[in-house]
Amino acid sequence: MVSRREFIIKKNKTIISVLVAFLIVVIGVFKFSFSSGYKISIENKTDKTIANLELKYKNGNTIKTISQIEPKKSLEYNIDTNSIQGENAIILTYKDNKGISYEESVVGYLEKGYSGKSNVFINEIDNNGNFGIEIK
């Protein structure tokens, strides 16, 4: 026959085991559902096709080469920040009609595991191929 004390101990062990299992599941869901990374959105609000853009880290490593964005269209990229070593930033580069390179800071400061969102709006392109860019 099981005494009352043994019954309470078994009941407490069962409750603790269920709570531990629940916590493990909750931690797993949060870890995989809210993974770190930056979402970069680039929207071409002009009437011209934009070509040859690059998203790069400040240290020079290319993240994504964008061959073109059609007029009134947008693209989104998810950048995994878990592989970043040390401090960094995300830069958008392009060239004007004369081949002169320009850089726009998309994310000013970044470290491993950071997350967030940055919206890049290309509102105009002048006759020289320079962009009027707004970043939010």
Identify the function of each model-found stretch.
Residues 40-49:
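Asparagine-centered strand-capping/turn motif at beta-strand->loop junctions
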Residues 56-105:
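Extracytoplasmic/periplasmic/luminal assembly and interaction segments
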Residues 13-31:
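Hydrophobic membrane-insertion alpha-helices, especially the h-region
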Residues 48-57:
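Short, ordered, surface-exposed loop/turn motifs in non-cytosolic proteins
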Residues 33-39:
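Short coil/turn motif common to extracellular beta-sandwich-like domains
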Residues 1-12:
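N-terminal Lys/Arg-rich, disordered targeting/topogenic segments
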Residues 84-135:
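Structured, soluble extracytoplasmic/luminal domains of envelope-associated proteins
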